Amino acid sequence: MNPNQKIITIGSVSLTIATICFLMQIAIQVTTVTLHFKQYECDSPANNQVMPCEPIIIERNITEIVYLTNTTIEKEICPKLVEYRNWSKPQCKITGFAPFSKDNSIRLSAGGDIWVTREPYVSCDPGKCYQFALGQGTTLDNKHSNDTIHDRTPHRTLLMNELGVPFHLGTRQVCIGWSSSSCHDGKAWLHVCVTGYDKNATASFIYDGRLVDSIGSWSQNILRTQESECVCINGTCTVVMTDGSASGRADTKILFIEEGKIVHISPLSGSAQHVEECSCYPRYPGVRCICRDNWKGSNRPVVDINVKDYSIDSSYVCSGLVGDTPRNNDRSSNSYCRNPNNEKGNHGVKGWAFDDGNDVWMGRTISEDSRSGYETFKVIGGWSTPNSKLQINRQVIVDSDNRSGYSGIFSVEGKSCINRCFYVELIRGREQETRVWWTSNSIVVFCGTSGTYGTGSWPDGADINLMPI
């Protein structure tokens, strides 16, 4: 083949390839335009529900990127069904509790910037669990941490992180408050935060990141709320709030909240004499709370909330092995279901329990007089039989040589049942540990299990001599 023939052959092949490429580009563009105009809209009926639909090819904000050569096609994914939580599944059957999470905040504070906190709790949205606490407006290794034993200052804010993530400097402060409660209704978070002067405080109701409602003090004596999660059923969230004496008659109200708006307020009724710091859980179709009687009883009050008609009843846990601190020893303690036992009732600590048929699961400090150690157990007949004392399935969570503090319940919905979990506040610093000037905490978290489990102790674990003063 002479040079001219080679040139002609190469040119012909190049022209053919170019033509093929050109035609392919035209085909791709035609396909892309066709796909962009091929739409099958989702049906969106009333009640804010989204029905299942076929995938649609259309440019929208919610997109999944699919690459085809050099062309980008944006494919919409139909939104998932978003519903209010109703908590209608049965309670899980458990044999005890297994370790779930520990944040080690105090140990980490020895060498890092970690918030000073107290009054922690845990709550979950439908997909993830979060830990909350009331911050003191300072990190531990900071002179502002001096004298943080005080409960109520204007600098306190509600902190929120994923469970297991200590409250570092990047932690979100969701509202201002020295008392709080939070819960997720299936669509968004509700936060209730109380702040202001003791005699004229304000509770702010923040829903989906926006301030929706508020209420002022009704008894001018330290308006306060649960210090653990509230509960939402079919879009109605219940929050127990108290205003009045911490060691005498107080005025407790149950607030019903829908998307952050107060829709009803019910006064406490029933036989409970004093109710504070309730640990609440869904008991479909209502809500049940186990609280703190800081006046007359070391047996814990029970508050039953009817979400449909706003009615309230109250009583006391029947178990003769009582849950508050201080308390009588187990041989001499009593509870007869309806009234406070008048045994070391003045003072107390936030705690929890939950019913299991006629029985009751509960947690409490191991010490009868101080916030030291922590144990859980089941009392046979403890929900229905006055002064029942048969204890089974006891577990030590924190040994008696180490400090504990507040504790509370939270609920987690599984595929077939609702599990009960609890957290324990592990307080460190003042008043007991006077080498330092701060007061703060870490937490440990356990959840119900139907399996087997071992033994151990999970204290805070920080060496106070290694901590900043």
Swiss-Prot record:
Residues binding substrate are 118, 152, 276-277, 292, 371
Pfam families linked: Neur (PF00064)
User: What InterPro entries does the database record attribute to this sequence?
Assistant: Glyco_hydro_34 (IPR001860), Sialidase_Influenza_A/B (IPR033654), Sialidase_sf (IPR036278)
Taking the first listed entry, what is the main subcellular location of this protein, grouped into a coarse class?
virion
Topology check: give the Intravirion ranges. 1-6
Any idea where this protein resides? Virion membrane; Host apical cell membrane
GO molecular function: any one?
A: exo-alpha-sialidase activity
What modifications follow translation?
N-glycosylated.
Q: Which top-rank group of organisms is this from? A: Viruses
List the keywords (alphabetical).
Answer: Calcium, Disulfide bond, Glycoprotein, Glycosidase, Host cell membrane, Host membrane, Hydrolase, Membrane, Metal-binding, Signal-anchor, Transmembrane, Transmembrane helix, Virion
Query: Which EC numbers characterise this protein's activity in its record?
Result: 3.2.1.18
Membrane topology recorded in Swiss-Prot or TrEMBL: Single-pass type II membrane protein
Q: Where is this region: Involved in apical transport and lipid raft association?
A: 11-33
Topological domain spans for side Virion surface: 30-469
User: Quaternary structure?
Assistant: Homotetramer.
Q: Which family does it belong to?
A: Belongs to the glycosyl hydrolase 34 family.
Comment field (misc): The influenza A genome consist of 8 RNA segments. Genetic variation of hemagglutinin and/or neuraminidase genes results in the emergence of new influenza strains. The mechanism of variation can be the result of point mutations or the result of genetic reassortment between segments of two different strains.
This molecule's function is given as: Catalyzes the removal of terminal sialic acid residues from viral and cellular glycoconjugates. Cleaves off the terminal sialic acids on the glycosylated HA during virus budding to facilitate virus release. Additionally helps virus spread through the circulation by further removing sialic acids from the cell surface. These cleavages prevent self-aggregation and ensure the efficient spread of the progeny virus from cell to cell. Otherwise, infection would be limited to one round of replication.
What is the recorded name of this protein? Answer: Neuraminidase
**Taxonomic source organism:** Influenza A virus (strain A/Udorn/1972 H3N2)
Gene it is expressed from: NA
